[in-house]
Amino acid sequence: MGYATTASAQDQIWLKDRRYGEGIGIRTGDFELHPGIGGEFGYDSNYFLRASNENPAPSLRARITPSITLSTVGQERREGESGAAEPPKVSFRAAVAGTYMEFIALDKADSNDFSEQRNIAGVGSLQLTIMPRRPFSGDIYADALRSVQPSNDANFNFNRFTTRAGAGLTWAPGGGMFDWRIGYEFGLTYFQDTAFRDLSNETHTFSTRGRWRFLPRTAVLYDGSVGITNYHLNPQNGQLDSMPVRTRLGLNGLITRQLSLLAMAGWGSSFYKGLNAQQYDGIIAQAELKWFITPGVGNELLGGPLPISTAALGYKRDFYNSYLGDYFLADRFYLTLSHLFSGRFLLVIDGAYTPTSFPTIYQGNRTMPTHEAFTAPRVDATAFGEYRLSDTFGINITTRYSANITDVIVQNDNLGWNRFEAFLGVRWFL
């Protein structure tokens, strides 16, 4: 079975960021409704993420993705219509999207494998803020995701349900120059295939974060968390419970009206519990230089929402719970660009190079190692272009290249692969 990378119901660019996906909407009182539907047809060179010597199976793919969001009218729109409007007592946003996937094998020998892959992925989310933009406020959120993710053996898959639910309290005295939040989040991951059911787990995360603004376009930031991860179904499957701890301190501010810098650094420790537990205990960090292409328009550091036209260059280092071994450490170097040309053509480009390090991997009973520590660089590059024929209809192209650059073999599984995807689509949105 293959250790594929995470997939989600949000492969489409317009689902990942509402700035790209939503149109004018339907206004009813203090609420906005944004329905939409997209259809795509394209090519996938290696859906099963197989190594070059394991018969990569190319295919044609079709995706149909309806979506709908409902939210209260934003503060900026309220102020634009009636001056300095009083913040609402409650604001919320709910969203639901689903993707139906169909496959056509390009090699007749792969027809049976692909006939079993048609599936539906979906995501739903809810965010609720109580007494927003006041000295004391609260937030509640929940989301549920069904991920469709193949292994390199077509008879098995990593399809799973992931849910989160959390709440927090925020204190913001003095007109919002200072704010501090404490929160709790519960997470549950459930694998549908019985071959991977033992990987199901639950997490509890207690977090806090603070911000102090000064100068007045700069802020000192702090965040910290303590987590508890448990594998309940089979403690002998080789996966270890853990209590990860993270703490970071940093700065976010404008260098000029069009250029901002985020820099955060701290320490993280994994605290895995069990025989031959492999631990991460070291630096975690993030740095990002962002260019606001349209000066002073919607810059969130100037008091508005993030605009569509931005570019960013960044680096992030963190450790993550892993289903292959105990954890992996990712050093991600990334570049992003999004720009709306003349209100008609949207271009979004994302690229990343991520050396990913794994510690020594042990077999299920944790007594014998199955592979020494190794690093497998990961490459991801996505380009999305959409021409909007009107305020509600667009034609788009999505291309994506991804690769795991390694020849490491773990338990007879070659972890190296590369994949190219290209889709032509149409989208209606309000």
Question: What annotation goes with each model-predicted range?
Answer:
Residues 3-9:
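Sec/Tat signal peptide C-region and signal peptidase I cleavage site
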Residues 9-430:
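Gram-negative and organellar
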